[in-house]
Swiss-Prot record:
PROSITE patterns reported for this sequence: ZF_THAP (PS50950)
Domain of life: Eukaryota
Phenotype reported upon loss of the gene: Embryonic lethal; embryos die around the time of implantation.
Source organism of this protein record: Mus musculus
Record protein name field: THAP domain-containing protein 11
Gene: Thap11
Keywords: Activator, Coiled coil, Cytoplasm, DNA-binding, Metal-binding, Nucleus, Repressor, Transcription, Transcription regulation, Zinc, Zinc-finger
ZnF endpoints (THAP-type): 1-80
Length: 305
C-alpha cells in the first residue's frame, strides 16, 4: 500500500488512506528515542520489538498521543488501544454467549416456520378452486343456451310470422320461456311490441351470461396460475436461484476488476503500438538516408569523383 504505515504492533493506520492523521518519525534525541521505544514496546509485546531499531522509514501515527497530536507539551506516545502481536488474547464473548445465540436462532427458525404454515392455511387449496369452477360451469352453459335459444326464436319469428315457438329446457333444468310472437299481420304496432320484447329478453340473457363470466373470472385466474409452474431463472446471477446479495456484489466487483485490468492492458497495448510506429518511422527515415547516401556514392563512382 502506498504511503506510510504505523509501526506499532496491531496498528494499521496508513498515511495514504487515513488523511486526517499525522505521522511522525522517531526523535533524534537519545532520551526521547528511548522513551518512545519503551512505550511502543509495551508489556506483552515481544519478538520484533526486542531488537527494534527505528529508521527513517518508520513512522508513528498521531493516534498514540494524548489529544490526537504531538505537541510541545505532549512529546511521548502513551496511548495504545490496539492489541499487540504477542499479547494474550482475551475472549470477546462470555461463556454462555454461543448457547444464547443458538437458542435465538432456533426461535427465529420456529417463528418463520409458523408464519409459513399460517400462509399455507390462508391460501385456498387447488381442489376447492376446481370444485368451485365445476359448479359455475353449468350456470355458464345454461346462460349460453338461453342466449342461443332466444336468437333462434327471433330468427324463426322473422321467417314464419304468426307461428308459436315451443318452450325449451336447458341442460340444468331451467325453463327458458321464448317470446310469443303470435300476432296479426295487419297490426304493425303489435309487431313492434313483440320485437321490443325480444330485444329485452336478449339483453337479460346476455346480462346473465356476463354475470356468470364475472363470477368465474377469479377462479379461472387461480387455475391458470397453477397451470404454469415456475421454471426458475435462466442465469446464475438471479436472486431466486439461491444467490445471496453478498455473492452478487462479489461477482460484480470481480467483473469490475476484470474490466479495469482489461482497460490497463489496452492502454499498455496502445502505448506499445505508438512506440512501434515511432520506431518504424525512424527506421524508414534511416533507410531513406542510407539509400540517398548510397545513390550519391554510385553517382560519384560513375563520374570518377
Amino acid at each position: 500500500m502506498p504511503g506510510f504505515t504505523c509501526c506499532v504492533p496491531g496498528c494499521y493506520n496508513n498515511s495514504h488512506r487515513d488523511k486526517a492523521l499525522h505521522f511522525y518519525t522517531f526523535p533524534k534525541d537519545a532520551e526521547l528515542r528511548r522513551l518512545w521505544l519503551k512505550n511502543v514496546s509495551r508489556a506483552g509485546v515481544s519478538g520484533c520489538f526486542s531488537t527494534f531499531q527505528p529508521t527513517t522509514g518508520h513512522r508513528l501515527c498521531s493516534v498514540h498521543f494524548q489529544g490526537g497530536r504531538k505537541t510541545y507539551t505532549v512529546r511521548v506516545p502513551t496511548i495504545f488501544p490496539l492489541r499487540g502481536v504477542n499479547e494474550r488474547k482475551v475472549a470477546r464473548r462470555p461463556a454462555g454467549a454461543a448457547a444464547a445465540r443458538r437458542r435465538q436462532q432456533q426461535q427465529q427458525q420456529q417463528q418463520q416456520q409458523q408464519q409459513q404454515q399460517q400462509l399455507q392455511q390462508q391460501q385456498p387449496s387447488p381442489s376447492s378452486s376446481t370444485a368451485q369452477t365445476t359448479q359455475l360451469q353449468p350456470n355458464l352453459v345454461s346462460a349460453s343456451a338461453a342466449v342461443l335459444l332466444t336468437l333462434q326464436a327471433a330468427v324463426d319469428s322473422n321467417q314464419a310470422p304468426g307461428s308459436v315457438v315451443p318452450v325449451s329446457t336447458t341442460p340444468s333444468g331451467d325453463d327458458v320461456k321464448p317470446i310469443d310472437l303470435t300476432v296479426q299481420v295487419e297490426f304493425a304496432a303489435a309487431e313492434g311490441a313483440a320485437a321490443a320484447a325480444a330485444a329485452s329478453e336478449l339483453e337479460a340473457a346476455t346480462a346473465g351470461l356476463e354475470a356468470a363470466e364475472c363470477t368465474l373470472g377469479p377462479q379461472l385466474v387461480v387455475v391458470g396460475e397453477e397451470g404454469f409452474p415456475d421454471t426458475g431463472s435462466d442465469h446464475s446471477y438471479s436472486l431466486s436461484s439461491g444467490t445471496t446479495e453478498e455473492e452478487l456484489l462479489r461477482k460484480l466487483n470481480e467483473q469490475r476488476d476484470i474490466l479495469a485490468l482489461m482497460e490497463v492492458k489496452m492502454k499498455e497495448m496502445k502505448g506499445s503500438i505508438r512506440h512501434l510506429r515511432l520506431t518504424e518511422a525512424k527506421l524508414r527515415e534511416e533507410l531513406r538516408e542510407k539509400d540517398r547516401l548510397l545513390a550519391m556514392a554510385v553517382i560519384r563512382k560513375k563520374h570518377g569523383m
